[in-house]
Amino acid sequence: LALVERGRMMGLAVAAAPRAPVGHGARFFTRSHESQREAERPSRPLRLLDLSTLWAGPLATALLALACVEVLKVESPSRPDGAGEGPAPFFDLMNGTKRGRCLDLRAADGRRDFEALLDSADIVVESARPRALSQLGYDAGSWLEERPGRLWVSITGYGRDHEWIAFGDDAAAAAGLAWSPAPADEAPCFCGDALADPITGLHAAALVLLHARVGQGGLLDLAMAPLTARVAAAEHDGLTTALEPGPASQGWQLVDEERRVPVAAPRARVVRAKAPALVAEGSVETTGGQLRPC
């Protein structure tokens, strides 16, 4: 624990790895600046401004794009999404259903265009510490106060106001997912790649759809580590029903004692379009690569 504390003092994403999930009853999101949509939902698709990077946020917005939300991904020319430096198929899978925009928020033109995008957005999703935007003069609370019924989704490791940071791997370890039900002398290991990211992305997308459906706006503060701990604890403590998948003569089923639920056969998602590339300011790139004015 002393090593973890020293790492956190240095601003590193580190965590202890408890043997048992510690998230029983953990609160994984908070809601503030609540409001209700004053008018009927517009007939146009919901507009989402995606300021998130890496995996959890981009996965949430990718799923929302599949649900007919119009998603525009905004990147900084000096600090683009780091996932773009990794495997291209993964980046395309996360962002191929979105349009893209490159904006320098330290330049007057970039700020003007960004503020116009903020004004037209119904939903904002970001995964930075609050001070990253506040240093540039942007505040979630102020944006929400002027726009009843709109949503601002913030995804961080432990919460917007928490001093600790986290990425998917260490958040999963902090949730107790580095150990399997095995002998006590077994060493810890990662259970999948950065599991806290997809768990958080799925929950974020579901929460956005739920709030949008009933017209409830506000700031949704999602914390990856507590959320993953809650999911892990539910499985560990038997709070959920474990359904075992298995092939059947007429397709796949989930089998729970005497109950059998037909499901589609498992399959990997396929890349349907290339992610929008970073393009010149004042332009938007579609997934087909054609530039058009914003």
Residue ranges and their predicted role:
Residues 1-82, 111, 115, 120-123, ...:
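Acyl-CoA thioester-binding alpha/beta core of soluble enzymes
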Residues 46, 98, 168, 176-177, ...:
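Residue-level detector of functionally special positions within alpha-helical transmembrane segments
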Residues 49, 94-145:
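A structured beta-alpha segment of the ubiquitous adenosine-cofactor-binding alpha/beta core
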Residues 53, 105, 128-130, 156-157, ...:
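Short glycine-/small-residue-rich Rossmann-like dinucleotide-binding loops
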Residues 69, 73-101:
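Glycine-rich phosphate-binding loop and adjoining beta1-alpha1-beta2 segment
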Residues 98, 190-193:
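Short beta-alpha connecting loops at secondary-structure transitions
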Residues 104, 160, 167, 194-198:
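Hydrophobic alpha-helical scaffolding
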Residues 139-144, 164, 168-172:
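Glycine-rich beta-alpha-beta "Rossmann" dinucleotide-binding loop(s) and their flanking helix/strand
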